[in-house]
């Protein structure tokens, strides 16, 4: 029985790539800077001491980081026995965004340039805004700018509740984000608005990767909170991913846990499981692993590393999240069967010590574990698509156009 379990620790980069200068990210290092802060006692809020990730270390995380950066992460064990195969991978895609990283992991790098809304104020074309107001029968809109998702709620959340005007905002990513109150505006109405925005962006040729619904609750600035009912409307990958090939060619199954299905626009997904928060995502993953049959991929995105701690530049929160994940990792490893493979990886970096609030261009870890996986270094990988090609070889699908088998 062949099964693959893919765990994406969203934004968990392990050191700047060779082309990081193109992105202003030279010196970024999500793992390294978290470990450094922990070792200095600068991340003791809700946790304490050096970064403690013994299980990820045994799978080769510290070695992969050393390969990427040339140094051992502060306070971590560079001499631990390694029981998995490990690598550090460079992104071939032109961006450092979520769809690009995930699609490339599945064997389809993004070699075109996304469209972006680059102006920090009055970010969106008036023609687009007018169409949204007319089609959705809106009283107007708020925002129309670049912003952090939590900051803009404090700035405009109360006005949104009074006026019913949705909050439109973007970032350095190829995104159009819409924040609305779940109760006063309504979740269904928000989703309908996002569908309209997706249509207009596609028809208008803006080439925007995602429209993101950002529902929130609360009653005043300071206590607004985004909920777990986020919904991403992505464009479809430009070519069949290894997920699609497994389903189409082998009549296999792909189980999405978390936001995976949204990222792939449901292409190649046979089952969707929603969960919010690190523990809930982990619990849902364990349940699906226990139930998974032959020719199945269980694919989970642990979004909190990115959304809750990376973008918010919360080093202590990120460290605590990693330590929680590591404590629970043995539960997951115990479910890996004789012919199974477990792959732990990321989709980009989001260094919580870095300036700004955006992603960072970094190598990602590729940690592969299974009874038949030979432990040791798989070296520097030129593309995330090596993961997709490895899965294609493992399941016996037709080969991907990009990437090399690692096993």
Curated annotation (Swiss-Prot):
S-S pairs: none
Enzyme Commission number(s): 5.4.2.7
Note on cofactor: Binds 2 manganese ions.
Annotated binding of Mn(2+) 1, by residue: 10, 347-348
Assigned keywords, A-Z: Cytoplasm, Isomerase, Manganese, Metal-binding
Listed transmembrane segments: none
Superkingdom of origin: Bacteria
Reactions that this protein is recorded to catalyse: 2-deoxy-alpha-D-ribose 1-phosphate = 2-deoxy-D-ribose 5-phosphate; alpha-D-ribose 1-phosphate = D-ribose 5-phosphate
GO BP terms in the entry: 2-deoxyribose 1-phosphate catabolic process; 5-phosphoribose 1-diphosphate biosynthetic process; metabolic compound salvage; nucleotide metabolic process
Cited HAMAP family: Phosphopentomut
Family the UniProt entry places it in: Belongs to the phosphopentomutase family.
Identification of the protein by name: Phosphopentomutase
């Amino acid at each position: 029985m062949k099964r693959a379990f893919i765990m994406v620790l969203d934004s968990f980069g392990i050191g700047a790539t060779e082309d990081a200068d193109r992105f202003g990210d030279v010196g970024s290092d999500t793992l390294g800077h978290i470990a450094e802060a922990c070792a200095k006692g600068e991340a003791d809020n809700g946790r304490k001491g050096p970064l403690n990730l013994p299980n990820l270390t045994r799978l080769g995380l510290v070695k992969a980081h050393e390969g990427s950066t040339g140094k051992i992460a502060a306070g971590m064990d560079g001499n631990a026995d390694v029981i998995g195969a490990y690598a550090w991978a460079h992104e071939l895609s032109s961006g450092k965004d979520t769809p690009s990283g995930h699609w490339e992991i599945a064997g389809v790098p993004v070699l075109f340039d996304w469209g972006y809304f680059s102006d920090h104020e009055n970010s969106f074309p008036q023609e687009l805004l007018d169409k949204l107001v007319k089609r959705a029968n809106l009283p107007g809109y708020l925002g129309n700018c670049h912003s952090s998702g939590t900051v803009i709620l404090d700035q405009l959340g109360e006005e949104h509740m009074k006026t019913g005007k949705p909050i439109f905002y973007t970032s350095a990513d190829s995104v159009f984000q819409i924040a609305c109150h779940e109760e006063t505006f309504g979740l269904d109405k928000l989703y309908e608005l996002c569908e309209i925005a997706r249509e207009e962006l596609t028809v208008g040729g803006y080439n925007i990767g995602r429209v993101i619904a950002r529902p929130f609750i609360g009653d005043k600035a300071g206590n607004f909170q985004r909920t777990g009912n986020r919904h991403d409307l992505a464009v479809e990958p430009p070519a069949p991913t290894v997920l699609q090939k497994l389903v189409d060619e082998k009549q296999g199954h792909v189980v999405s846990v978390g936001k995976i299905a949204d990222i792939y626009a449901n292409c190649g997904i046979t089952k969707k499981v929603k969960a919010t928060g690190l523990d809930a995502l982990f619990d849902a993953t364990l349940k699906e692993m226990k139930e998974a049959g032959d020719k199945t991929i269980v694919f989970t995105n642990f979004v909190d590393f990115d959304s809750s701690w990376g973008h918010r530049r919360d080093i202590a929160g990120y460290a605590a999240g990693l330590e929680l994940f590591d404590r629970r990792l043995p539960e997951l490893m115990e479910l890996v069967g004789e012919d199974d493979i477990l792959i732990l990886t990321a989709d980009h970096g989001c260094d919580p010590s870095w300036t700004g609030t955006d992603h960072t261009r970094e190598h990602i870890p590729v940690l592969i574990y299974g009874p038949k996986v030979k432990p040791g270094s798989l070296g520097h990988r030129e593309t995330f698509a090596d993961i997709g090609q490895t899965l294609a070889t493992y399941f016996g699908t037709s080969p991907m156009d990009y990437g090399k088998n690692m096993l």
